[in-house]
């Protein structure tokens, strides 16, 4: 019996995937079936960041019938640069990092449903959903938007915001310490692939927090800002109060690792994202698809980082929407979640938050469906 060549390739991909699951590569908690929020953690020290393992990328290309080019533009970003979409009027101010692109008009966390708010049912897989119209300050659609959930690595949007507001010198180099490496390894946490003794610029660490969801970058920045993660978390909770988030919003760590009292609502997450979007540097980081960390003392070729949500949603039917900013997350208690922002096909500026989707790709498809429906 002759087997179709396409089927043969997919069978080979499955075999490779199974062999990878039995390898010595370290996986974070979200590595269900080897297909994750982004992909396997790289610990081989060869400059390949999380989600950029070439074997894994080859497998995904086969499974999803892609051409095997992880950078759709066909080019590699220059070290220390990005391939972010243009944001008119947004500049990296390089110091202070408190410049805003727009004034706050409303608190998304405190918005209530209106008569025009649509109830979102079975058309998306996620259990927690909110869709905001940023132009009108309204909730277009929702599902359990006032219920408490664990934000997982969406937490890192607040981490980014607090860091940029407290670190004026983007060129300062911080050292990745052995305790950071040990912490990440012990918990199987998402990381950028930094090693002990590596010296990395603050600017590069900021991108490392968001694009590969790097806990190593988070801990280095937290220590620099507040002396410890606990001190940094106190600043995060203070920022939550300043933003007027709900009483359900509480941080226990800076990476989004599961804790029973680390939680918020999807509306809270929406306001955190909106606050980050008002900061020019945070907005730039969140809207970057590819970023090249330049050579360090430990990685001679630097490290390439990719926001795979932004990359992958381009393959989905969004009804003409352009999704330009995103941060994903996973813990078992809230499954796959994401916050994103973009312009709908009809010109509406939307912000979407979902929680408890069943898989990486289901989360992406949920967002695509919501942009198509409400954009």
Language model features with spans:
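Residues at alpha-helix termini
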Residues: 243-244, 280, 289, 328
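Bacterial N-terminal signal peptides
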Residues: 14-22
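Conserved active-site loop region of the serine DD-peptidase/beta-lactamase
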Residues: 278-319
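Bacterial N-terminal signal peptides that target proteins for export
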Residues: 3-12
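Structured C-terminal helix/loop/strand segments within mature extracytoplasmic catalytic/sensor domains
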Residues: 25-141, 145-149, 167-168, 173, ...
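Active-site-adjacent loops and short helices of periplasmic peptidoglycan-processing enzymes
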Residues: 30-39, 47, 58-61, 66, ...
């Amino acid at each position: 019996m002759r087997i179709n060549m396409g089927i043969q390739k997919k069978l080979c991909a499955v075999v490779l995937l199974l062999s990878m699951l039995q390898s010595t590569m370290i996986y974070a908690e979200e590595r269900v079936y080897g297909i994750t929020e982004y992909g396997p953690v790289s610990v081989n020290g060869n400059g390949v960041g999380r989600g950029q393992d070439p074997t894994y990328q080859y497998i995904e290309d086969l499974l999803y019938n892609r051409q095997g080019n992880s950078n759709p533009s066909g080019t590699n970003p220059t070290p220390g640069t990005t391939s972010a979409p243009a944001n008119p009027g947004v500049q990296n101010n390089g110091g202070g990092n408190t410049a805003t692109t727009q004034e706050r008009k409303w608190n998304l966390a405190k918005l209530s449903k209106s008569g025009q708010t649509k109830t979102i049912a079975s058309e998306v897989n996620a259990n927690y959903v909110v869709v905001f119209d940023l132009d009108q300050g309204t909730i277009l659609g929702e599902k359990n938007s006032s219920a408490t959930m664990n934000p997982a690595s969406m937490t890192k949007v607040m981490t980014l915001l607090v860091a940029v507001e407290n670190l004026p010198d983007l060129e300062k180099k911080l050292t990745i310490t052995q305790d950071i490496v040990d912490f990440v390894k012990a918990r199987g946490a998402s990381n950028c692939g930094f090693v002990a003794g590596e010296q990395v610029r603050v600017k590069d660490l900021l991108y490392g927090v968001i694009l590969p969801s790097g806990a190593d970058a988070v801990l280095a920045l937290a220590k620099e800002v507040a002396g410890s993660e606990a001190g940094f978390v106190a600043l995060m909770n203070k920022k939550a109060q300043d933003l007027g988030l709900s009483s359900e919003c509480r941080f226990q760590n800076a990476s989004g690792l599961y804790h029973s009292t680390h939680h918020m609502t999807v509306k809270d997450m929406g306001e955190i994202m909106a606050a980050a979007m008002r900061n020019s540097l945070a907005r730039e980081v969140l809207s970057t698809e590819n970023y090249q960390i330049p050579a360090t003392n430990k990685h001679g070729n630097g490290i390439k980082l990719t926001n795979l949500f932004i990359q992958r949603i381009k393959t989905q039917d969004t009804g003409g929407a352009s999704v330009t900013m995103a941060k994903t997350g996973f813990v078992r208690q809230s499954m796959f979640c994401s916050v994103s922002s973009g312009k709908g096909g009809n010109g509406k500026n939307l912000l979407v938050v979902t929680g408890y989707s069943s898989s990486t790709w289901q989360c992406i498809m949920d967002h695509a469906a919501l942009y198509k429906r409400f954009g």
